[in-house]
Amino acid sequence: MTEMEASHRRWNMIAGAAVFVTAFSCYLTTIGSTLAFWDCGEFIATAYILGVPHPPGTPLYQLVAHLFTMLPFQEKAFSVNLMSTITGALTALFIYLITVKILVQWRGTPKGPRDRMIMYSSAACAALAAAFSSSHWSDAIEAEVYAPSAFIMTFITWLMVRWGERYREPGSRNSLVLICFLIAISVGLHLGTALVFPAFIVFALVVDWRIFTDARLVVLAVFAIILGLSNHLYLPIRSSLNPRIDEADPQRWAAFKDCILRKQYKPMTIFVRQAPWSFQFSMFWRYFSEQWTGAGGSWTILLMLAGAFGAVIHYLKHRRTFILIAGLFLMLTLFLIVYMNFTDHEVRDRDYFYAHGFIFFCPWIGVAFAYLADLTASTKWSRWLTPVALAVMIAFTFSSYFVNFRTHDRRGDYNAHDYGYNMLATVAPNGLIFTNGDNDTFPLWFIQEVKNFRKDVRVVNLSLLNTPWYIWQLKHIEPKLDISFTDKEVNELRPFRDRDGKIVMVKDIAAKDIIDRNQGNRPIYFAVTVADYMGYDPHLVLEGLAFRYEPKEASESIDLTRTLYNLYSVYKYRGLLLPAAGGPASAPQFTDVRKWGGADSTDFASRYVYDTKVYKDTNTQRLVTNYAAAHLKLCVYYLQNAEFDNAMRELERAILVSPGFEGYKEIAVATYGYAGQIAKAESLAYSFLAAEPRNVNIYLQLFRVYRRANNQQGAEGILMRLINALPDNPDGFSMLASFYEEQGAHAKAADIVRRWLDLHPNDKSAANLLQSLEKKVRGE
């Protein structure tokens, strides 16, 4: 090794370490303290108990994450999050190393300080662009499979590039065996990791096609692949022990195969598009364009143009490695657009599917920056111009850190944790609760398995209830449910169409049987997030975040005592509410839950504030509206019983816990109006109408407020405003005509109906009404 090469190796290691420390520090200062919504709760819970998560099971992730749960941290969720943080930072490190190798193959080993400065700074910019990209940053601070998968992908790619440099050296083919093993074993992290394989094959063909004629190498590669895939034996081994979370029950060959192939999900097809091509590509472009500047940013195009320019330079300077990087980028972006075939109504943003592709775009940013820096080095002002240019490039890269920091800071975010805790705490001892999907199921599993809280409650996920293995587990694994079907009958359950033509799903059959067999023995609940209550609505009574099922039709739709107790004395709101300055350290406790008297009740909203320090994405905001909805339900109850002070308290609490919730507007107008605060009701209504001039319910609610206050002029005025704003809406005309009739102003009523008929001459019922009114005007 020459002195120049030794110097390069030493400084390259120092720069790489700096990149790793920078990325790791970024992630460590924004890492989630506990679980996040979506799959995180499930992955942490199954890693902790060595269970089986949703197909395809991610066995390698479970094993490695379980080791992280053994770290001496009290919060096990943080320990598993740390796995993503470390692998996310390692991903940035290997993007740096890959970019350096590309630059060395093009520019040669750096010959002096300025050459090293250009190379290492440009490669660091590429790595930090990857580290600060929105999707990868999100993956690196929560318990998900994508950061470990990205690390393995970049490590494999670095090995490929390294082999491409040394393929003529003795023993270099051993790297290919290692690559095959890593690709195979990493499928146990995420199936998408296998997408590096086509790029690997093409790159190997371009570099040295003769390796495919080496029988010994082929045999070793096949053996390495089989050995790597063997980590999937975890699934049947652990499943046979019946852990409390055992999705797909893959202990038998048929179930194991179905788990790997994800048979329980809707089959994918690339030929029947689930959304127009234009939508799917525009969705991808939106995700791509928001990576470094956030939604609505204007700088992204510059960074993306730099990457596109770098791709051209890379192609011109070193086509071998260009083929590898371009192949990876295309497989992880364009291929996925075609293969994943996303709908135009996905339940969440799917940017994380393309995160690896965005990462492999970043080396081209480094190539572009190095090329531009070289241009400055060839000028007579290079002594100062090159450092300035590199400083600008580094600052530009770091700008994405500051732009994305707010939306990626998970410190203090306990919303998912407390949501799961609160929902479980709602359920009476030994109860069961029907849930709907990921976000009302996985946090509950986490709280039960990791926190060891309320394991007496049986969580029944309605989506999984369509599968026979899940029904079997509900029947045979503690806490067991009484189910009338035999195991054979469970396997034979199929959807059918009833007499009315409605499709009855397996979950409908199973849920009805569970309710029929367990009512009276177990308290039964439905989470408020359940979309279809299967006709049991009249039997459901709200108790906070869940409805309790009553065998007979309920006389009240809300249990006032239990709901108040849960909302104010049981539920936790960390990351959502904070005590105001000088306020209490914890939520007040009830003494008389029906008439919550004393100082605690009158100024609650002023003693607690919305926690603006904790960022809440749209999904979190949507889920916490369930707290607001419960308070609004209480508000309506109090309005109906003329308890206006209590109604205002609940309204203010609803607005406090979910400021962006749209559902409170009409109720707010009613609450203040019925409480006699007409001016405030008017002010609110007109502010709402300024933003939503076509919101009919606001007009009508303010009309009712005026009528209740005997303000006939105000009532007439708001209805006139409604018919002027919405001349095609019949409600305003109908109510105004009725209002005039009640006042005995039949002529005015007739004029309103004529005005409607001028716009809608074919309305026969309006024509008949006009005839009746005209008779009254004539005194007939």
Task: Give a label for each model feature.
Residues T2-E3, V100-G108, C125, I141-A150, ...:
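ER/secretory pathway lumenal C-terminal domains and tails of membrane proteins involved
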Residues E742-E780:
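Terminal, low-structured helical/coil segments at or just beyond the last alpha-helical repeat
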Residues A654, S687-F688, R721-L722, R755-W756:
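Canonical positions in the second alpha-helix
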Residues P59, L71-L93, L97, R116, ...:
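Loop-to-helix entry region of an early transmembrane alpha helix in multi-pass inner-membrane enzymes
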Residues L50-P56, V64-I86, T91, T99, ...:
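Juxtamembrane segments of multi-pass membrane glycosylation machinery
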Residues Q640, Y674, R708, E742, ...:
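Register position in tetratricopeptide repeats
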Residues S79, H631, Y664-K665, Y699, ...:
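Canonical tetratricopeptide repeat
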Residues I31-F43, P53-V64, F78, R244-D249, ...:
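Extracytoplasmic catalytic/substrate-binding loops of multi-pass membrane glycan-assembly enzymes
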